Amino acid sequence: MINDENFAHRDNLDFLNDSGSLRGRVVAAHHVVRRRFEFIARIALTLYDAETGVLKAYLHSGPQDDPLEHYQALLDNAPSLKEILKRGRPRVINNLVTIQDQSHEHTRRIGRHGYAASYTLPMFNNGDFIGFLFLNSPEANVFTEDVLEQLDIYGHLIALMVTSEIAAVHTLAAMVKATGHITHHRDPETGSHLDRMS
């Protein structure tokens, strides 16, 4: 006889097995994080384009409008983010009001939306920088070492989801490009169309 008690535990991360969108999975991860750390009001991702040096706001999990929707900037024009890469370590700002340089647009936008603390984790794929993960809170001084130790696990898990998504897109683009090369030999017009689509 099967004992139902053996199956009583619910896997809090079972959403990772779903085939939903990356945003849906990040929102689900945010819900799991908030069960433990209610003060995490927003998780956001920026992606880095190595060819252009541009960071682009990609997605966020917050309930309100994204303060950085459609925002992009050269990494070279974001010295505090560039410093994260130089040091190879995440950045913790426990009180955004204390930031001396409020001249950057992204800092002003985050502040206007009521975020008081920020944790920024760089994301890598096999050693290559791919973007940043931001965890924001409306409360100051919440990112203690104990909290950060646990948030690192969630942060790296989300980074792996992003890496997986990027790999799938690159694979699809490579397949379309290969198909275009084959099609060029048989039908140049269709091959040119596939080149434009990839």
Predicted regions: what is each one?
Residues 1-27, 35, 164-178:
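Signal-transmission linkers at sensory-effector interfaces
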Residues 51-52, 124-129, 138:
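Flexible loop/coil segments at beta-strand boundaries within sensory signal-transduction domains
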Residues 65-101, 105, 109-111:
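Regulatory sensory and allosteric helical modules in signal-transduction proteins
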Residues 116-124:
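A short, aliphatic-rich beta-strand micro-motif
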Residues 130, 136-152, 162-165:
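Regulatory loop-to-helix N-cap segments in sensory/regulatory domains
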Residues 169-198:
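… and, occasionally, acidic/histidine-rich disordered N-termini of signaling adaptors
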